Amino acid sequence: MSSSRKQARLDAKTNIESLSVQPYPNSNKVYIEGSRPDIRVPMREISLADSLVGGTKESPIFEPNEPIQVYDTSGVYTDPSYDIDVYRGLPKLRQEWIEERNDTELLDGVSSVYSQERLADETLDELRYGNLPTIRRAKQGQCVTQLHYARQGIITPEMEYIAIRENMGRQKFADEQLNHQHPGHSFGANLPKEITPEFVRKEVAEGRAIIPSNINHPEAEPMIIGRNFLIKVNANIGNSSVSSSIEEEVEKLVWSTRWGGDTVMDLSTGRNIHETREWILRNSPVPIGTVPMYQALEKVNGVAENLNWEVMRDTLIEQAEQGVDYFTIHAGLLLRYVPMTAKRVTGIVSRGGSIIAKWCLAHHQESFLYTHFREICEICAKYDVALSLGDGLRPGSVADANDEAQFAELRTLGELTKVAWEYDVQVIIEGPGHVPMHMIKENMDEQLKHCHEAPFYTLGPLTTDIAPGYDHITSGIGAAMIGWYGCAMLCYVTPKEHLGLPNKDDVKTGLITYKLAAHAGDLAKGHPGAQIRDNALSKARFEFRWEDQFNLSLDPITAREYHDETLPQESGKVAHFCSMCGPKFCSMKISQEVREYAKDSEQVALDQAIEIKMIDDPLEGMRQKSEEFKASGSELYHPAVEAE
C-alpha cells in the first residue's frame, strides 16, 4: 500500500472513531411524534432571523419568521443528544415493530456457507464488526414484506412514519407568501395535498411505491420511493481492487447521509466485501442496496464463466441476513438481446450486464438469474429485500440511446415485475444511462407502459458525452428532466464518473447536484409544499438576511465561503448588497426603495415610482462612470504600467 493510501486510511479511521455531532448551521434536530411514542420522525429545522418591517433606525420594528422544516437523512449523526459510537452501531429504530408482528424467527447462526467460512477465519477478527446482531427470517409460510402488509390492508408503523416524513411539517405554515406555489405539470402522477398513512399503504399495495426495509436492518429510518412522493437520490460508495478501505467507506456513508443521500449502494468489488458491508449496515440510517453479482464474481476469482446459481444463491442469503435492503439483479438481459448490441458505439457498459452477457455467450443459455428468478423472489420475501431490476443493456453513449436492445430488456423487466409481485416482493426498475434531452421522455413513457408503474430509478441520464470531469452536470440536467416526468429515484453521478473512484468531496458534489435536480423535479411536478423552502430563501434574499440565505441553501458552507471571498467582514453579513453589483446597483435594494417611495407618497403609483427611482440612482451612477471615462482620455485601452 502506498504512503498516500495508508494516510487516507488512517485519516478515515481517526474520523470515524472521533465522530461527533455535526449539525448544520443554525439548524436543530426536531422529532415529530406519531400515534405511538416510538414513531418519532426526524426533521431538520432551520431557524430564521426576524424581518425588518418598519419603524426608524433608532426604533426598528421586526416581524418573526417561522423556522423551516426540511427532510433529513442524516440520522443521529446530527442529533446532539446521541452519543455516536460506530463500534456499537445505530439505535435499532424498527426492532420493536418487527417483533410485534410476530411473523419472524431468530436464527441460531448465519445460514450462508460463505458467511460461516468468514466467521471461522480468525485472521479476519481485526476487520470484523464486533457487535453483530441476531439474524431474523420469516417464519415458515409467512411473508414479511411491506408490500404483503399493504395488500392485506395493514398500515404499518413504517407507513405512518413515512407519511409524517413526506409532509415535512408543512401543515403548520400559515404564511400565504411561503405557501404560494406555481401549479406543476405532473404527467399523470397523483399528488395529494397531504400524504396520509392510508395513501402510503395504497401506493405500496399497487406497486407504485416501495419501502426498502429488510428485517435485518432495523437501524434504517423508513423512507419511500415512488413517483407520487418526493424524488429520492441514491449515492454510490464502495471499494475497488485498487482503492479504498473499510474506514473510508464508513466515512463516505456518514458523509453521504449528511448531504442528503436517501439510499446508499455499496458497490464494493475489492477485498473484504462481507466485512465492509457489515460495518456500513450497522451504521446506516438509510436503506442500503448492493449488486450481489459483484461479490459472487469475487467468489469465483473474477471468471464470469464460472458463476453458477449455487454461488449466487448463497450470496443472496448472505447479504439478506446481513440486512441489505435492495438487490440490483440483471435478470432481464436475455441471450437473444446480446447480438442487438453489436453495432453500438459503446457496447454493453453495465458491469453486471457485461458479466451476464459473457456468461450467456459462454454457456449459450439464459442466465441463472432469469431461470431462477422465482427462487430469488422466495429469498427476498423471507427478509423483505426489494428487487431493483437492473438495466444491463443501458446505453453508454448518447449515440446508443433508446435502441432496440435497451427497450427489449425493459419489456422483460416488466414481465419479471409481475412475477415478483406474485411473491409480494417490492420492485423498482433501473434505467439509463446516456440519453439526449429530446429522447428522455420516451424512456419514462416506455417504462410506465411496460413496467406497470413500478418506480423508475435512473443513473442520470447524461445528456451529452463531451464533458468528462463535469458529468455530474451533464447528468444532473437529465436527472431533473426525468424526475419531472415521473422518475422516483435518481442515482447520483460524481465529477469522477468515467475517470476514477470518487472521494469524499466528489460524493458531496454529486449529492448536492442531484438534490438540486430532485428538488427541481418536485417543483415542476407541483409536489405539495415543495416551494416553501424556495419562497423562504427568496424572502431572505430580498431582505438581505444573508445568514438565512446561507442556512436555507442545499450547501450552507459553500454559499457562505463564496460570499466571504469578497465580503469577509461581519458587516458584509448585514450589508444591503453583495460584491457583484455593489451598493449603488443592487436591484433588490432599489426595489425596496421603490416600494418605500410608493408607500410614502399616496399620489405616486408603483410604476411611476419605478421610473422616478431609475432616474434618481442608476443614471447618476452612469453619469459618474461617464465622467471617469472622459477624464482618462476616452481611450478604450491603456498601456500597462511597468513596475519600477
Curated annotation (Swiss-Prot):
Q: What is this protein called?
A: Phosphomethylpyrimidine synthase
* Region (Disordered) residue spans: 623-644
One Pfam family recorded for the sequence = ThiC_Rad_SAM
Q: Which family does it belong to?
A: Belongs to the ThiC family.
Entry function: Catalyzes the synthesis of the hydroxymethylpyrimidine phosphate (HMP-P) moiety of thiamine from aminoimidazole ribotide (AIR) in a radical S-adenosyl-L-methionine (SAM)-dependent reaction.
Q: Name one GO molecular function term.
A: zinc ion binding
Organism in which the protein naturally occurs: Aliivibrio fischeri (strain MJ11) (Vibrio fischeri)
Give the superkingdom in one word: Bacteria
Which pathway does this polypeptide act in?
A: Cofactor biosynthesis; thiamine diphosphate biosynthesis
Q: Where does substrate bind?
A: 236, 265, 294, 330, 350-352, 391-394, 430, 457
For the ligand ([4Fe-4S] cluster), the binding residues are 578, 581, 586
Give the EC number(s) listed in the UniProt record: 4.1.99.17
> Top EC class per UniProt?
lyase
Q: How does it assemble?
A: Homodimer.
Question: Binding of Zn(2+): at which residues?
Answer: 434, 498
Record-level GO cellular component terms? cytosol
Q: Which GO terms describe its biological process?
A: thiamine biosynthetic process; thiamine diphosphate biosynthetic process
> What are its cofactors?
[4Fe-4S] cluster
- Reaction catalysed by this chain? 5-amino-1-(5-phospho-beta-D-ribosyl)imidazole + S-adenosyl-L-methionine = 4-amino-2-methyl-5-(phosphooxymethyl)pyrimidine + CO + 5'-deoxyadenosine + formate + L-methionine + 3 H(+)
How cofactor binds (record note)? Binds 1 [4Fe-4S] cluster per subunit. The cluster is coordinated with 3 cysteines and an exchangeable S-adenosyl-L-methionine.
Q: What keywords are assigned to this protein?
A: 4Fe-4S, Iron, Iron-sulfur, Lyase, Metal-binding, S-adenosyl-L-methionine, Thiamine biosynthesis, Zinc
